Amino acid sequence: MSRFFYGNDSDSDSSGSDEEELYSDEEVEQSEEESSEEDASSEEESSEDEDAGKAGASRFMKDVSDSEESEEEDVVKVVKSAKNKRLEELESTIKLIDNAQKINDWAVISSEFDKMNRQVVKVLQSGPVPKIYVKTVADLEDFVNETVAKQKSSNKKMNASNAKGFNAIKQKIKKNNKEYAAQIEKYRADKDSYMESDEEEEKKPAIAAPRLSKLERVEAPVAVAGDDDGFETVVRGKTLQYTPESILKHLRVIVESRGKKNTDRLEQIKTMEKLLEVAQTPYQRIRVYLTLISTRFDLSTTSTAAYMSVEQWKAAEQELSTLLSVLEKERNYVVSEGAEEWEDDEKQPQVAAGETFYIPGSIVSYVERLDDELTRSLQHIDPHTAEYIERLSDEKQLYTNLVRTQIYVEGLTKLEKTELRQDSLNRVVMRRLEHIYFKPSQVITILEEGTDKALPSELETSITTRGNSDAQTLVQTLCNYLFRNSDGILRARAMLAQIYFLALHDQYYRARDLMLMSHLSENIANFDVSSQILFNRTLVQIGLCAFRAGLIYEAQNTLSEICGSGRQKELLAQGIILQRYSTVSPEQERLERQRQLPFHMHINLELLECIYLTSSMFLEVPLMAQTSSSPEMKRRVISKTFRRMLDYNERQVFTGPAENTRDGVIMSAKFLAAGDWKKAAEMLNSIKIWDLMPQPEKIKEMLSQQIQEEGLRTYLFTYAPFYDSLSISTLSTMFELSEKKIAAIISRMISHEELGAALDQVNDAIVFRKGVELSRLQSQIVTLADKSMNLLEANEKTLEQRTQGMANAFQRDQGAGARGGRGPRGGGQARGGPRLPGGQQRRPGGQQFGGGALGGAIKA
């Protein structure tokens, strides 16, 4: 053939090599003869490129290389079937395992063992178990046992990678060899005769096909494919036949592929859905449902989405509901944690009447995972959209499954009470409690009624009473059960949930007493973060309850710990405040986001701030009036947050009308401090956020009454020094309070020593005592003395910080004949300065300033 047809490039060669792959669709490796031929042809092509610059006539003359190529074209090519190629791959893997055994490389053995098992699965599709595979796994098990014995007798330890591989093989080999126990026994009975016996299916001989020229291969690929007598093209995607007998085998393959890379879980889900259609026995259906639900959860774990898709969640929820129905009907099958797995995939367990067969699994874990996935989706969905409301409606089905799971596990616990089952029952009861403790009674009643209708009528529970939808009774019953049967975190969370529920329903004193008796405030730092968040939420709810009851001091005192920090969002898990120079790692931030509560569980932070500032106003304004008229009192601050906002507002040159809730409270405080309680009440009641509270008119009435009382206290503190006596009827007219109420307020102020006065009940007047308060000059002197002492302390602290380790130089004891710094020997003065009268040396850092002449005058 003329070389003109080849040209100067290798396009025809590459296309020819592509067509050669038509001889076998699943050909993985080229034979050594083919690779050598291709190397030779590539060398010829390179030589042709080198001779490209020759004269035109010499290009078309037949050279020695042409004769060599024509001889190579006559060499035959060996075509191998897909089965033989798989066997060759298996043999090469076994050789690697044998070589690794010789050098005790367990890391290689472990990886190649997994590879070998994957190859055997393909080989089994077209024939029986290869005997060489049986020999390898049997010898490998013996080798593992020998290595274990050597490890016990010798002190030499494996390195980390070897030990990891050895432990993996030790676990895998026993489980793997159970499937081939019969073949392994035959092999160990007589190894030589087992390996020399003929295979059950003889290998078909490879057919020698003549090697075609490159041009013929390009022109007639179909003819070549048709000349392979005895072979047929293997098509990928062969349809599998699912039968009831093969269900357990398919499930084992799916379970073993869990956690491995490049696993198509959607395809596995489709496979199990088909297995459900052919499943005939309850055992088969239970096994398929358990694996199917787990695979759906794995799908969400490996995906890039932040939460499980709605379709997959609803499918898993429906499958869990169906699984519970099967378990409720088939009482002789029990899904239990810690049960032994059924190893024989060839046959199903036969359960006699009255016996119970345990299947490994955890229904409680499934319903907990469904709950977590629903919460995660609610965390990421915009709460101001219809999608959030629609997603929140799925809670009803989840709550029904929670109750069914509780009844199912409760029945198992009655049959055989173990610590593991009791723990599972406690977990599911806690989950149920967490779904209702923050809801109003009306919502809980509707939810319970819907759940009772959805449950089968034959299901009964002893923990709660079916048909009783009273919310308070339900919460009390669930909490009492957890108090009796759990301890640690679950018990503490149940206590917090009950306190939250009581505070939400205006039972302040019961909630407060439970919180105090539980001593949770002392131990909450030792609990996990989610429990600390629940504690903070409960504390806030108690404060809100106290405010609704008109207990202003208790409300401010309770809310100060949360609201005074300025980190309400973080402490209540309702948002993350990312600071500019934050040292939080991405992992910590991710965990923090996972702990965030869904929007429907949030406490209104604007309402919370308004209540805290209002409570602080009622306490701070009278206190400010008291300290301004009585400078001898030690200045104390109840709410730094309120004081800071008030100072900022007073520094403004121009103050416009209130634009938000915070401005409304501050302006109301300024009116109250000025004595205009009517404007203060009007401004405070005009805040629209009070409408978000239950019974807003009652709240506004309570606020108006509170402003009247605190306005009276503020007036008395401010103008007491200027009165000798004051009529109660006058105060009653000014503040529109009854005389009896005014007398009670004044009596309380006198008993608390807040006001130096006495009640004249005959004349219905207040008689103020004179001489109790300091004069204006005395007040200024006391203030000056306090400031001087503070200045001295600050100076001495600064001196100590600068000298630090040199403090001893200022307080050396000077004995007889000792050196006094740079002074003369003997009884010279120390460098620390002159001694005080009586031989006592002045010590730095103390408070020796007595106020000088001014202090002496005060003391006199």
UniProtKB/Swiss-Prot annotation:
Start-end of Acidic residues biased regions: 10-51
Any matching Pfam family: eIF-3c_N
Domain PCI: 599-773
Example of a GO MF term: translation initiation factor binding
Residue spans of biased composition, Gly residues class: 817-831, 847-860
Record keywords, A-Z: Cytoplasm, Initiation factor, Protein biosynthesis
Any single Gene Ontology cellular-component annotation: eukaryotic 48S preinitiation complex
Compartment(s) where it occurs, according to its Swiss-Prot or TrEMBL record: Cytoplasm
Similarity-based family: Belongs to the eIF-3 subunit C family.
Function: Component of the eukaryotic translation initiation factor 3 (eIF-3) complex, which is involved in protein synthesis of a specialized repertoire of mRNAs and, together with other initiation factors, stimulates binding of mRNA and methionyl-tRNAi to the 40S ribosome. The eIF-3 complex specifically targets and initiates translation of a subset of mRNAs involved in cell proliferation.
Name this polypeptide is given: Eukaryotic translation initiation factor 3 subunit C
Biological classification of the source: Eukaryota, Fungi, Dikarya, Ascomycota, Pezizomycotina
